[in-house]
Structure formats: C-alpha cells, structure tokens
From Swiss-Prot:
GO terms for cellular component: apoplast; chloroplast; cytosol. Coiled coil: none annotated. It comes from Flaveria pringlei. Through the carboxylation of phosphoenolpyruvate (PEP) it forms oxaloacetate, a four-carbon dicarboxylic acid source for the tricarboxylic acid cycle. PROSITE patterns: PEPCASE_1, PEPCASE_2. It catalyses: oxaloacetate + phosphate = phosphoenolpyruvate + hydrogencarbonate. It comes from the Eukaryota. The active site is at H172, K601. It is an enzyme of class 4 (lyase). Keywords: Allosteric enzyme, Carbon dioxide fixation, Cytoplasm, Lyase, Magnesium, Phosphoprotein, Photosynthesis. It is found in: Cytoplasm. This is Phosphoenolpyruvate carboxylase.
Length: 967
C-alpha cells in the first residue's frame, strides 16, 4: 500500500496545487511528512501482523478512496462487507490501524504548520488575518499597529503593559487520547521535525529513523482505550502536567520575545515582570455544575494542595541554578545588611541539599539571600505535602511562604541591588525569568475557579430559612429574596449554627465554602454560578461566603448560557448594579461568563452566535452606565458547535469595546493538548492570544450597520424556530438521534469524570452539550452547527432579493459575520451526508428514513446558500491548505465511519448475522496464542459479543482524531 498510497497522496497534492495556482507553495512538505509516517507505520503493521492484514488495510483504504472520488454508496456497502467479514481480533487491529494513521496525519500536519510558520517569518511576511490557518505573531502585530495603523510605539507599550489574558484550563471530557499516547505523539513530532532539519548528518538521520520507528510502534502497541473513567484528581494531574512540560518555561521565553519585539519598534524597556500579561486558572477539581458526584469538597482541597506542592517544587528545582548564577560580590547596602543578618542567624550546614549545603559566606551576598529563599521553598513544599498526605503538618507557617508578596520581596531586593551596581544586564537574565514566573504562577500555580448551579445555593438557603421558621426561601419572590439577602448581608449576626439539619447536598455545598475559608485565598479565582438568572443568585453566594467565614471572598461570576438567559442578562446585571451594597462590594469591577455550548444546543449556532454578540454589547453598555469595568469570560468549547474556531479570528470578531485588554477564556479538553502539548505550540498559543487581544483593543472591528442588525435579528428568529421545531418539537427527533448516532454508547469511552447527562433521565434538554456535539461529529453530519442557517438565509433572500447582496457585503466587511460563515463552511468541508445516509439505512427504523432524508436535503440546501453568500464555487476554495489537510484524511475517516456503522448494527441488532473469514493476523508471541483472544481479553466484562465494544470505541477515537474535534 505504501507505494500506491504515496502515488495517491502525490496526485491529491498535484490536484490541490492546480486548484488555486500559486496558493499551495512549492516548499509545502505535508505530503512528504504524511507519506513518511505512513510508510513507517505500514512496515510496522506488516512486521507485527503479517502481509494479509496489511493487504486488508490497503483494500479498505482503496475502497474509501474510490468512494471519496464519486460518492457512490455502493462503495460504502462493499467496504462494509470487507469489514464485517473480519474476526473480532482482526477487526480491532484494523480499527486501531486507521485510528493510528489519523493520529499520524495530525502530527504531520502540526510539523508542517510549524515549518510553514518559520518560512513565513524568515521572509518577513505579514499573516493573512482572514485565513483560518494563519495568525499574527506578537512582532507582526506591533509592526502592523505602528506602520499600518499609525499608533505610536509608546501607545502600543502602554496598552500591552495593562492587558491581561487569563487562560482557564477545564476538564471537559473532550480529550479522547490517553496521556500515555500524547507523550509518544510528542516524541514522534520531535523526530519528524528533526529529520527535516537542514545540515543533518547521515548518522543522525539513521538514529532519528530508528527512534521514529520505535515511537510509532510503541504508540500502536499501547492500548488506546481508557479502561476506567478518570477521577477529578486524575484530570487535574493531567492538566498540571502541561505546566511542568511546557507552560512553566514557555511563559518567560514568550515574554523575552515580547521584549525583543518591543525593541524592534523602538521601545528600549522590557515588559515589567509584574505586568499581568498572561495568567492561568483551572476548573479541574472545582467544577461541580450541579450533580458532579466525584467533585467533593475533599477533592477541591486535595487539588489546591497538590497544585501548591507542585508550584513550590518547580521553584525549588530552579533555585540552585539561580544561586550558581548569582556569584557576584558587589551589592547595595540594603542587600548587604540583609545578607549579614541572615548569615548570623542561619544554620551552619544543610546536608539534604545537593549544592550549597555548607553555609554560604557573606562575601557572596546574593547566594545568602537566595539560600534563605531555598529553605522557605523547601518548607513550603513539605508543608503542602504533609497537609495533602495527613491533613496536618508540624512545619510552622512562619517557616514557609504564605503569600506571593513574601516570596517576591527577596527576589526584588536582588534585582534592585544588581541594577544599583550597574549589573542590570545580569538582573535581566535568569533572575528576571524567575521573577516573571513568580508573578505569573504565584504560590498556587493556577487559581482554581469553583462552579456550582444556582439551584444548589437555593437548596442551602431554603434549609436555613425553614430551620429559622421564617418561610421557604425557594418559594419566595425575587423581590423578597433580595430584601432578605441584603438585610442579612448588612447585619452581623450569624445565620445558622451546628444544629442546622443538612441533607447530603446541603452539606456538600457548605463544606465547599468551608474549604474556601480554610485554604490560602490565592488558591482560588472566581465563584461561577451556572444557570444564573437573577440578582439573588449572586447575592446568595455572597451571603454563604460570609456565613462560612471566607476571609477574602471570591469574586462572584454569573454564567448566562441559554438563549433566554442571554437575552435577559443585561437587565439582570442592571438590577444587580443598582443595589448599593453590591456596588460597594465589587469596587467598580465585575466579571460575567457567557456560555457558548448550551446556548448553541438550546437555539442552534446561528442564533446563539448572534445573541452572544448582542449580549456582550448590551452588558458592556450597562456596566459603563454604572461606572463598572466589566470582564467577559468566554466559555468556548473546541468544536464550532460549542463556540470553537481559530483563536485569533474568534478574538478579532468580538464586538468592539468588549475586550478592552482583558480576556478570560476556557481552554477545554483536546484544545489543551493542541495549545500546550509542545514547546512551540505553547509559544504560539501565548503569542496568538496576546497579539489578538492587543489588536482588538487598539484596532477594534467595525460595528454592524443598523440594516445588518435588523436582517440578523429577523434571520435569528427564523433560525431558532427552524432549529427548535426539529430538535425539541419534532416527535420523531429524539428516537432518530439515538438510533442514527452513537450517543448512547458515548459514555463507554471513559474520557471524563462527569456524567454525560445533568439528570439521569430526560431528553435532549438534559444531555450535556459535549455528547450532543460529539454524537453528530461521529456521523459527519454536524447537525447542531448548520441547522437553522439555511432557513434563515432562504427567508431573507425570498423576502427581498437585494438581501443576498447585503449578506455578501456583510461577509466581505464584517469580521463577526465572516468568521461565523467561514467556520460553518469548514464544518461542511469535513461533513459527508453519505455517511449519515449509511447510518440511517443500517441503524434507523424504516419509518424514520423519510425524516433522515429531509434533514439531508436541508443540509445540501444550507450548503448551497452558504457558498452563494461567501461567493465560493466550492467549499474552502479560498483556503487550499485547509482543503489539502481535510482531503488527506478523508479516506481514513470514511473507513472508520463505515466500521462504526456496521459495528453498531451488530451491537444493536441481535438478528444481524455476518459470515466471518478465517483469522488473518499473525502475531509474534513468546508462546503460540490466538491474538484475537488476547485483544478481547483487554475487555473481559463487555456485555456485547467479543471484540465489538473495543472496535466501536476505537472508531470513535479515530473519527475524533480525524475530525480534530470530539465535543
């Protein structure tokens, strides 16, 4: 297959180069990278499983490729016959092989993107901001602002110093690849990048070839399937591993690049080390969101202590290197006095240190100071470890750092002293990097947000009011709730004592507040209230924080998710800001979170995107009226259906005046790996967030014209009606959805700790947004993304033919509208209604077939309208790179789609019989064995026929890798 596949890839490449002459450059190496990895893998497959199995993989690939050429459904049935004739062990190996090939295609693509970026930088090209595959780096953005937009370098520097990007890592269950495999993928990526480096010697090449072979084989031999669901502590450790591996060193490296870029526009100052350019927060271990049974108060406590221990350990691991560097004897008098005092009071020898274990003499004053810092870091780490393991520690608080100011003070003293003595160049080396790390990560590494549903707070307050015999808080009107809450907040008496009767749920909420009171305040960020609808939801949390003695109360952030909540959000915030007590409490600063996932599930992507846009404008307007600086926290997922898309485009298409140098955004699931999995990815992520935030503030996008707004409002009404009439009102829809997609089987992937439903029973409403999008992504039908668009466009153009011209103008000149259309176009390029039709034929009862056909007709009509508005003849004609990447993976994904459909048929229909051919895989083993039995033994408790469950899960993971989205 290798040679034939190489020819096929080369022919696709040639077609793509002809498609848009001059657009896919001659130095593009994606095909070469892809073919190299595929060649290696197929050799490994033959070595491990024999020629016959490799031939079966080849046959499947070629049938898929033939289908991709003509979209003849008979080819899918032929492919289905081949796949269903395999015995259970062979079926697992083939599903695993195609899943593995898609992961390799992703790695080839990542290396190619990095390669193309380096070439562009060498040429000094400006990025094409309208293109979904490119983005400006920080230097390009500075130059663009100064040279093209006539901003002064000082204005740029001033805006930069005062901006903040807070990236919030969440444990949303969308990372379908195990950490064991992610690490191997990282090593494959590195080998591939080094193999194509210039000046590589023959010996280096040979060793890299061997390493590449080893890592590809190791990845293939690793079980892709998580056999048990992760706990919140597992998720937190997985999230924290990115800090250890890339983010920790990536931040100072990125800030140095910012310094260099500033120099290149004439600013001879560095970004101050305490400028809050980048911050990190987390939801891992803090995200309850209603009934998440595994996130308990104890888990929250453990996660905070673990993060604290990790932070002090990472500082501790660097401090001796810094002591080696700080060998200077000249210092200012302030530092000398401190060093002599420490020398007199310090212990003599410290034998548990590797370096500088003997007492440092006062002639090396910086080392004396840093030695004391080292002692305190050691104690800080050990105290966190004791508290984590035993709940108590004999290390007193005086011997540790309890807040970041204590930690920064001696480091700042060293920095000032070096500058005073003419050694600024030394101060601006590793010491500056260390100071920047301390300012960014503090003592807690990340700040943990707590998220809880508003109903859970209502339960607690209802228990309190019933116990006090003053009525039922739950049944009170909003006015009465506010009146009582404000009276209690203004008073000083405690509301309840230890005699308060507590259900398990009430105890859980109160114990969480007790953890907030117990741990250092710098462990925590925001307290987010999901399903927030009224001011009392916010005041309730303020009161509970006070009652549980939280010394430094967390800022309270309402989260508006559904369409009606987004529409009501500006009025709710105005009511909240009009309360004197609350305005005094917030000191002119407020954060509001908007949810992209649930709003999309509630009303469809078109209406959700437009309502999110309008809600931001309105909330900002309300905040300005009350003199409040508002930060909008964007709860975006990775997929387009959950608000995802290229970062720079997403930021630059936000309404003007809504970011103003403060951006807070979630980084979820698989997006964490795509953003921080490698050093260069981390660097690029920090650049794109900072650059786009700066550009949005200094060069805001245009506001839509009144006639555009009017048209959008009309279309949104039609889009919502169309979406809801099908998803919520059509009686056949729920049955069709459950039959046509693997939604019911989603939970078997074990990719997250939380349940896939908010309520155990219930329909689409109770299903979380992630499995909702995941299920449609698997069938390549993507219904939640496009449903409603076609009806909206059809209505607008039928009403007045001039509206087509207006929509085309909106696409050309309004970033928000262009990004919305481009992202849906990208999803159509990844879609294939032929796969959905196959699923219908195999899995859906015949009486529902006409319903499926009507949805597919809607899909095609929507696609046609989309192309008309974008002025494109074909999907992605303006983005050949993306088209190239999608085309390369289509044949792999199609095989997995067909395998999934037939596997689901075998699982769900006991009367569906297949004829199996003899086992074709050979396997090396110490003793003769049946490899099928070995593979099936990995899942001995499956309720299905042998091998079917693992085959199904492998197809899900492979399709997720191929679509580059799970949920």
């Amino acid at each position: 297959m290798a040679n034939r596949n190489l020819e096929k890839l080369a022919s696709i490449d040639a077609q793509l180069r002809l498609l848009v002459p001059g657009k896919v450059s001659e130095d593009d190496k994606l095909i070469e990278y892809d073919a190299l990895l595929l060649d290696k893998f197929l050799d490994i497959l033959q070595d491990l499983h024999g020629e016959d199995l490799k031939e079966a993989v080849q046959e499947c690939y070629e049938l898929s490729a033939e289908y991709e050429g003509k979209h003849d459904p008979k080819k899918l049935e032929e492919l289905g016959s081949v796949l269903t004739s395999l015995d259970p062990g062979d079926s697992i190996v083939i599903a695993k092989a195609f899943s593995h090939m898609l992961n390799l295609a992703n790695l080839a693509e990542e290396v190619q993107i990095a390669y193309r970026r380096r070439i562009k930088l060498k040429r000094g090209d400006f990025a094409d901001e309208a293109n979904a595959t490119t983005e400006s780096d920080i230097e390009e953005t500075f130059k663009k602002l100064v040279l093209k937009l006539n901003k002064s370098p000082e204005e740029v520097f001033d805006a930069l110093k005062n901006q903040t990007v807070d990236l919030v890592l969440t444990a949303h269950p969308t990372q379908s690849v195990r950490r064991s495999l992610l690490q191997k993928h990282g090593r494959i990526r590195n080998c591939l990048a080094q193999l194509y480096a210039k000046d590589i010697t023959p010996d280096d090449k040979q060793e890299l070839d061997e390493a590449l072979h080893r890592e590809i084989q190791a990845a293939f031999r690793t079980d892709e399937i998580r056999r048990t669901p992760p706990t919140p502590q597992d998720e937190m450790r997985a999230g924290m591993s990115y800090f250890h591996e890339t983010i920790w060193k990536g931040v100072p490296k990125f800030l140095r690049r910012v310094d260099t870029a500033l120099k290149n526009i004439g600013i001879n100052e560095r970004v101050p080390y305490n400028a809050p350019l980048i911050q990190f927060s987390s939801w891992m271990g803090g995200d309850r969101d209603g009934k998440h049974p595994r996130v308990t108060p104890e888990v929250t406590r453990d996660v905070c202590l673990l993060a604290r221990m990790m932070a002090s350990n990472m500082y501790f691991s660097q401090i001796e290197d810094l002591m080696f560097e700080m060998s200077m004897w000249r210092c200012n008098s302030e530092l000398r006095v401190r060093a002599e005092e420490l020398y007199r009071t310090a212990r003599r020898d410290v034998k548990h240190y590797i370096e500088f274990w003997k007492q440092v003499p006062p002639t090396e004053p910086y080392r004396v100071i840093l030695g004391d810092v080292r002692d305190k870091l050691y104690n800080t780490r050990e105290r966190s470890r004791h508290l984590l393991a035993h709940g108590i520690s004999d290390i007193p608080e005086e011997a540790v750092y309890t807040n970041v100011e204590q930690f920064l003070e001696p480091l700042e003293l060293c920095y000032r002293s070096l500058c005073d003595c003419g050694d600024r160049v030394i101060a601006d080396g590793s010491l500056l990097d260390f100071l920047r790390q301390v300012s960014t990560f503090g003592l807690s590494l990340v700040k943990l947000d707590i998220r809880q549903e508003s109903d859970r707070h209502t339960d607690v307050l209802d228990a309190i009011t019933q116990h006090l015999e003053i009525g039922s808080y739950r049944e009170w009107s909003e006015e009465k709730r506010q009146e009582w809450l404000l009276a209690e907040l203004s008073g000083k008496r405690p509301l309840f004592g230890s005699d308060l009767p507590k259900t398990e749920e009430v105890k859980d909420v109160l114990d969480t507040f007790n953890v907030l009171a117990e741990l250092p305040s710098d462990c925590f960020g925001a307290y987010i209230i999901s399903m927030a609808t009224s001011p009392s939801d916010v005041l309730a949390v303020e009161l509970l924080q006070r009652e549980c003695h939280v010394k430094h109360p967390l800022r309270v952030v309402p989260l508006f998710e559904k369409l009606a909540d987004l529409e009501a959000a500006p009025a709710a915030m105005a009511r909240l800001f009009s309360i004197d007590w609350y305005r005094n409490r917030i000191d002119g600063k407020q954060e509001v979170m908007i949810g992209y996932s649930d709003s999309g599930k509630d009303a469809g992507r078109f209406s959700a995107a437009w309502q999110l846009y309008k809600a931001q404008e309105e909330i900002i307007k309300v905040a300005k009226e009350f003199g409040v600086k508002l930060v909008i926290f964007h709860g975006r997922g990775g997929t387009v259906g959950r608000g995802g898309g290229p970062t720079h485009l997403a930021i630059l298409s936000q309404p003007p005046d809504t970011i103003h140098g403060s951006l807070r955004v979630t980084v979820q699931g698989e997006v964490i790996e795509q953003s921080f999995g490698e050093e260069h990815l981390c660097f690029r992520t920090l650049q794109r967030f900072c650059a786009a935030t700066l550009e949005h503030g200094m060069n805001p996008p245009i506001s839509p014209r009144p006639e555009w707004r009017e048209l959008m409002d009309q279309m949104a009404v039609v889009a919502t009606e169309e979406y809801r009439s099908i998803v919520f009102k059509e009686p056949r829809f729920v049955e069709y959805f459950r039959l046509a997609t693997p939604e019911l089987e989603y939970g078997r992937m074990n990719i997250g700790s939380r349940p896939s439903k908010r309520k155990p029973s219930g329909g689409i409403e109770s299903l979380r947004a992630i499995p909702w999008i995941f299920a449609w992504t698997q069938t390549r039908f993507h219904l939640p993304v496009w449903l409603g668009f076609g009806a909206a466009f059809k209505h607008a153009i039928k009403k007045d033919s001039k509206n087509l011209q207006m929509l085309q103008e909106m696409y050309k000149t309004w970033p928000f509208f262009r990004v919305t259309i481009d992202l849906v176009e990208m999803v159509f390029a990844k879609g294939d209604p032929g796969i959905a039709a196959l699923n219908d034929k195999l899995l859906v009862s015949e009486d529902l077939w006409p319903f499926g056909e009507s949805l597919r007709a809607n899909y095609e009509e929507t696609k046609d309208y989309l192309l008309k508005i974008a002025g494109h003849r074909d999907l992605l004609e303006g983005d050949p790179y993306l088209k190239q990447r999608i085309r390369l993976r289509d044949s792999y994904i199609t095989t997995l789609n067909v395998c999934q459909a037939y596997t689901l048929k075998r699982i769900r229909d006991p009367n569906y019989h297949v004829t199996l051919r003899p086992h074709i895989s050979k396997e090396y083993a110490a003793e003769p064995s049946k490899p099928a039995d070995e593979l099936i033994h990995l899942n001995p408790t499956s309720e299905y026929a042998p091998g079917l469950e693992d085959t199904l899960i492998l197809t899900m993971k492979g399709i997720a890798a191929g679509m580059q989205n799970t949920g």
